[in-house]
């Protein structure tokens, strides 16, 4: 099953932008499986499009994540503080992948 992930992180103290587009076919089988499991664990396709924080801080990271799988496409925007715990590991992993280039 094909899956594509577009990921962007902005904000933080330095205001650095980290962005990447990941085609699952370009990853190792283990990495692809792990990412897919993280997307499933977060119930990503059921999440609201915008997850707002009750206390928005200017130096928080903002995340924008789009996942395309089969006929489905869903985008979620969330701040660090607002992101549900199920999304945190996915954001961390994608940030690492984005930095790896």
Annotate each predicted stretch with a short phrase.
Residues 1-101:
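Function-determining sites in protein domains
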